């Protein structure tokens, strides 16, 4: 009976050692997973910063060009407004006189399709 008790004790100790080894392995695995996750996060952050820097650099070059385009468009708009304004003042009297002549010099005529019925 003592040998059975001793055998049971050995089995319990072996089971405890196996359980301890499993727990230790789980801890190491979790530690490696956390470390891998932290490294991946650091790599992702570094990549994101690099891409954002590239984007800002490209955006600055494009926006600089767009800023120049906006200035050119504004200048062209001012020139066209001045051109239209001078054209308006140049032809205003003549056009106004033509409109008044058409309004005052009415020549009443019957339409060609009009049929007079008595």
UniProtKB/Swiss-Prot annotation:
Keywords: Coiled coil, Hydrogen ion transport, Ion transport, Transport. Residues 1-12 have a biased composition (Polar residues). One of its GO terms (molecular function) is proton-transporting ATPase activity, rotational mechanism. It comes from the Eukaryota. Residues 3-53 form a coiled coil. Residues 1-37 are annotated as: Disordered. Residues 14-26 have a biased composition (Basic and acidic residues). One of its GO terms (cellular component) is vacuolar proton-transporting V-type ATPase complex. Subunit of the V1 complex of vacuolar(H+)-ATPase (V-ATPase), a multisubunit enzyme composed of a peripheral complex (V1) that hydrolyzes ATP and a membrane integral complex (V0) that translocates protons. V-ATPase is responsible for acidifying and maintaining the pH of intracellular compartments and in some cell types, is targeted to the plasma membrane, where it is responsible for acidifying the extracellular environment. Belongs to the V-ATPase G subunit family. V-ATPase is a heteromultimeric enzyme made up of two complexes: the ATP-hydrolytic V1 complex and the proton translocation V0 complex. The V1 complex consists of three catalytic AB heterodimers that form a heterohexamer, three peripheral stalks each consisting of EG heterodimers, one central rotor including subunits D and F, and the regulatory subunits C and H. The proton translocation complex V0 consists of the proton transport subunit a, a ring of proteolipid subunits c9c'', rotary subunit d, subunits e and f, and two accessory subunits. This is V-type proton ATPase subunit G 3. It comes from Xenopus tropicalis.
């Amino acid at each position: 009976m003592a040998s059975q008790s001793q055998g049971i004790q050995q089995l319990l100790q072996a089971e405890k050692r196996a359980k301890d080894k499993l727990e230790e392995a789980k801890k190491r695995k979790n530690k490696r997973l956390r470390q891998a996750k932290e490294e991946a996060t650091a790599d992702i952050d570094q990549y994101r910063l690099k891409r954002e820097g590239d984007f800002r650099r490209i955006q600055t070059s494009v926006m600089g060009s767009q800023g120049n385009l906006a200035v050119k468009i504004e200048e062209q708009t001012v020139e066209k407004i001045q051109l239209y304004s001078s054209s308006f003042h140049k032809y205003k009297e003549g056009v106004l006189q033509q409109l008044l002549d058409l309004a005052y010099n009415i020549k009443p005529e019957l339409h060609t399709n009009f049929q007079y019925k008595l």
